[in-house]
Amino acid sequence: MNQDHPEFDSEDLSQNPPETDPLKAEIESLRSEIALVKADALRERADLENQRKRIARDVENARKFANEKLLGELLPVFDSLDAGLTAAGTEPSPLRDGLDMTYKQLLKVAADNGLTLLDPVGQPFNPDQHQAISQGEAEGVAPGHVVQVFQKGYLLNDRLLRPALVVVAKHD
């Protein structure tokens, strides 16, 4: 027993008074609630950051492919100019030179906007970029390689806009 204060016993100090047990329980409850709120805040912050990244990616894709419709509608024009150049032959003439300049200028403008021409003669057949319309025999061309292109294909910023229509060399 404590002599100055007989109401306090040293054994009593190790035991908690009855009113502190509910306080400890409330403190533990609040601590667990704080931990939950912190976890929720971290999760919300991560979700917000992921949403920002997704929006930035979507905006970048929208910018990269905004002219997809226009360039897609120009593909028949490229085809017509290419066919006109083929029909004009190789003899120089003012008409052929004008067609050639127009075709090259149009291709440059399209290339500046992300369009890439696929003209795969002699390359291995790539089902991601080529559409085989037939097989043919060709000397000097390895089997599975493109022998002829019926219609050129195009990529827009490395995404297929139109596959090249090709003839593939037969396997022996």
Swiss-Prot record:
Sequence segments annotated as region (Disordered): 1-23
CDD domains: GrpE
This protein's UniProt keywords: Chaperone, Cytoplasm, Stress response
Molecular-function GO terms, alphabetical: adenyl-nucleotide exchange factor activity; protein homodimerization activity; protein-folding chaperone binding; unfolded protein binding
Record's keyword annotation contains Cytoplasm: yes
GO biological process: protein folding
Cellular-component GO terms for this entry: cytosol
Compartments where located: Cytoplasm
Subcellular location, principal: cytoplasm
Keyword Secreted on entry: no
Matching InterPro entries: GrpE, GrpE_coiled_coil, GrpE_head
Similarity-based family: Belongs to the GrpE family.
PANTHER family reported in the protein's UniProt record: GRPE PROTEIN, GRPE PROTEIN HOMOLOG, MITOCHONDRIAL
Subunit structure: Homodimer.
Function: Participates actively in the response to hyperosmotic and heat shock by preventing the aggregation of stress-denatured proteins, in association with DnaK and GrpE. It is the nucleotide exchange factor for DnaK and may function as a thermosensor. Unfolded proteins bind initially to DnaJ; upon interaction with the DnaJ-bound protein, DnaK hydrolyzes its bound ATP, resulting in the formation of a stable complex. GrpE releases ADP from DnaK; ATP binding to DnaK triggers the release of the substrate protein, thus completing the reaction cycle.
NCBIfam families, per the entry: PRK14140.1, PRK14147.1
Name assigned to this protein: Protein GrpE
